[in-house]
Amino acid sequence: MAEMKTSPSQDEEAGVVAMQLATSTVLPMILKSAIELDLLNTIAKAGPGNYLSPSDLASKLLLSNPDAPVMLARILRVLATYKVLGCKRGEVEWLYCWTPVCKYLSNNEDGASIAPILLVHQDKVTIKSWYHLTDAVRDGGTAFNKAHDMSIFEYASQDPQFNKAFNRSMRGHSTITMKKILETYKGFEGLKSIVDVGGGTGATLNMIISKYPTIKGINFDLPHVVGDAPSLPGVEHVGGNMFASVPKGDAIFLKWIFHSWGDEECLKILKKCHQALGDNKKVIVAEFILPEDPGGSDSATKSAVHLDAIMLAYVPGGKERTEKEFESLAKRAGFKSFTKVCCAFNTWIMEFSK
């Protein structure tokens, strides 16, 4: 095999990158500890530009371990290296502060954060899946199912703690993403009713109804999911199976649903949606869109391919899709038109019109 020619400095840099990849479990596990210790929320509460030392943080977190400041300093150093925190030299210790990335990993004014997503993907339940990915590639099947002898949806229905953690992660993402979507997307205007298929505990629908209070909202998900849902004004929680039927409405909203299923399952869901809609009504889809070129290295591309790999490990047939693949699904399900409308935090809004 021909070797790619590189200069000595490029070759050394490649070796350093390879070493970083070899130790890449460090960052998510450090973040997990920082979140569990409430480190990021504590730094965020201090506000932008206000620096705290490891000793300050150990005191604020009421850590009795005498070695805690030194241990925190090492955790903080990792986070500063990845721009999760800012830093500057103090008289005795390095000092650390909030950054825009930290903003999304700590609770915002709505109490929402991306942190629960990180925690659910570093949970022992999901981590166990990755130890079975190699066997899944060799022998077929899905890593999560091999690890637990059941699907992730079946597991969630039987493990209340994991179910709550999973729902919390979806709630946080929905709150942050939908707030941005509602600032730019105008497709909810004029609707009399909307059905959120796979709407979890209703966080997304609650935000839509809060902005458009004349809309009747139906939050539709599996019975064990809506059973964990709070009472919300203007929202009716309905338990059921989207493969059997979907409640009728002026529009049907699906956020992060299709990436959990293969093409044939997505077609079944879309056809049920098509049946539930009147003429000239629409399905509103919110999903990541994979770029056509797999060689991109920007944050949006990496985030999308990370989620695609998660679907590979967790869900039979689950995957992220390109724009062309979404358009093909829409047309095959009988929808007349497909429109990519707007984007918020890498989640695209698409309309499939009947």
From Swiss-Prot:
Residues noted as binding bergaptol in the record, renumbered to the chain: 121, 259
Organism from which the protein derives: Ammi majus
pH-dependence of activity, as noted: Optimum pH is 8.0.
Alphabetically ordered keywords of this record: Methyltransferase, S-adenosyl-L-methionine, Transferase
Keyword Cytoplasm carried by entry: no
Name of the encoding gene: BMT
Regulation of protein activity: Inhibited by Cu(2+), Ni(2+) and Co(2+).
Family per similarity comment: Belongs to the class I-like SAM-binding methyltransferase superfamily. Cation-independent O-methyltransferase family. COMT subfamily.
Catalytic temperature dependence: Optimum temperature is 42 degrees Celsius.
Induction details: Up-regulated by Pmg elicitor.
Catalytic activity: a 5-hydroxyfurocoumarin + S-adenosyl-L-methionine = a 5-methoxyfurocoumarin + S-adenosyl-L-homocysteine + H(+); bergaptol + S-adenosyl-L-methionine = bergapten + S-adenosyl-L-homocysteine
Entry's EC annotation: 2.1.1.69
First-tier enzyme category under EC: transferase
Listed name of the protein: Bergaptol O-methyltransferase
PROSITE patterns per UniProt: SAM_OMT_II (PS51683)
